[in-house]
Amino acid sequence: KGQVEISINSFSDNPQSLGVMPEGSFFGEMSLLESKPRSATIIACSDEVTVLEVSETDFSKLLLEAASITYRLLLTLNNRLNNMLDRIEPDDKRFVFKYKKNPIYTTIQKMDVRTFDSIAKKDPDYVWELLKYLSSSLEKLNREYISQKSI
């Protein structure tokens, strides 16, 4: 319930906003997917914010047992990656091209829920690799975006 602002520290240790996440959004998945410390800070935009905390164990179990939730996570991460690619302004256009032409990225762009469900049943490790790829790519792009804003 409510909205939160997501920010990450820039190289000068000043928090830089990546934007406001609307009600119903999820966050913290990058840390859970990669078993790394969180890279972002979340700040409530009002006194009326309610969040649900999910342990790493429960998160992993949920992703393995609920393909529809995993598919939604995959699409959401892909959309966030795509939105960040649209927001950054690289001097070298090959930077954006590298992500948009990556076979993993293009596969996800075309994947429907049935295809995803079939892949998830046959090869759950591949699904984890897709999620981790998107997560690490998004973190890199977030850092690139913040470094551009700091200049």
Regions found by a protein language model. Give the residues of each.
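Phosphate-/nucleic-acid-contacting segments
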Residues: K98, P103-I151
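Glycine- and acidic-residue-biased ligand/ion/polar-headgroup-sensing regions
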Residues: K1-S12, E23-G24, T106
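Cyclic-nucleotide recognition modules
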Residues: S17-N78, N82-N83, E89-K93, K100-K121
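Short, flexible helix-adjacent loops and helix caps
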Residues: N9-F11, E89, I146
